Regions:
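Primarily NTPase-proximal linker/entry elements flanking Walker-type ATP/GTP-binding cores
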Residues: 1, 12, 201-203
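The conserved Walker
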Residues: 1-3, 159
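A broad detector of the eukaryotic-type serine/threonine protein kinase catalytic domain
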Residues: 3, 43-53, 125-131
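P-loop NTPase switch/communication element
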Residues: 11, 18-63, 170-171
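P-loop NTPase motor-domain active sites and their immediate coupling elements
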Residues: 16, 24-27, 67-205
Length: 205
């Protein structure tokens, strides 16, 4: 619902992640179909690409993320680790420390495993995009949601209109973590949380 604090919540999540992580540790893909909410982050070093405002480019960005997820999962498999935190702890960090302790030159770093920063894909106002590319968008979101966490790729989706046309059953089944701010009706609350309650919130985030 308008005025519920969604934009404030999104900015707080982004700022908290920026404060805690360097560009080497975390990268963002920000999608802002409304043009005014996330474009203020253009130019920060954490962005993998300028803030995406063109709906056509959103599908391309998500397809890139799927390929990157699959590439990373192959790297994890080759190094016999289960997720990206284990990769950093057992593979990348020890190799980097050994390289630095040896006083090697940067051009000799070819033997050091590739650093894999976390990637956060944040889509503001999913409803606008779902009205244009419902099937393609749902397919990309579900593929990422199913396997991307181990690869260090995370999705944050937001919408003012939590209808079943936007938060489809398939998307909902694959995104277990949800936050509901104030909504207009009990039906909207049930769409997000599977229970009533969000319609009784004060509307201040």
């Amino acid at each position: 619902t308008t005025g519920s604090g969604k934009s404030v919540a999104i900015h707080n999540i982004i700022i908290s992640l920026l404060f805690r992580n360097s560009p080497e540790q975390l990268r963002f893909v920000l999608v802002d179909p409304k043009l005014v909410e996330l474009t203020l982050y253009n130019g920060i070093p954490h962005l993998l690409t300028p803030v995406i405002t063109d709906s056509k480019k959103v599908i391309l960005a998500l397809k890139w993320a799927i390929k990157e997820m699959e590439r990373r999962l192959e790297i994890l498999r080759d190094h016999k680790v289960q997720n990206i935190s284990s990769y950093h702890e057992k593979v990348y960090r020890p190799a980097k420390e050994k390289f630095e302790a040896a006083g090697s030159l940067p051009e000799d770093a070819s033997g050091v495993p590739e650093p894999l920063p976390y990637i956060v894909i944040m889509i503001d106002e999913l409803a606008d995009l779902m009205s244009i590319y419902p099937k393609e968008l749902e397919s990309c979101i579900v593929r990422l949601a199913q396997k991307s966490r181990a690869a260090g790729i995370h999705l944050i989706l937001s919408t003012q209109r939590p209808s079943v046309n936007v938060i489809t059953g398939t998307i909902k089944a694959n995104i277990p973590t949800r936050i509901a701010l104030q909504v207009a009706s009990q039906i909207d609350s049930r769409t997000i949380l599977d229970q009533a309650g969000a319609e009784k919130l004060l509307g201040r985030g």
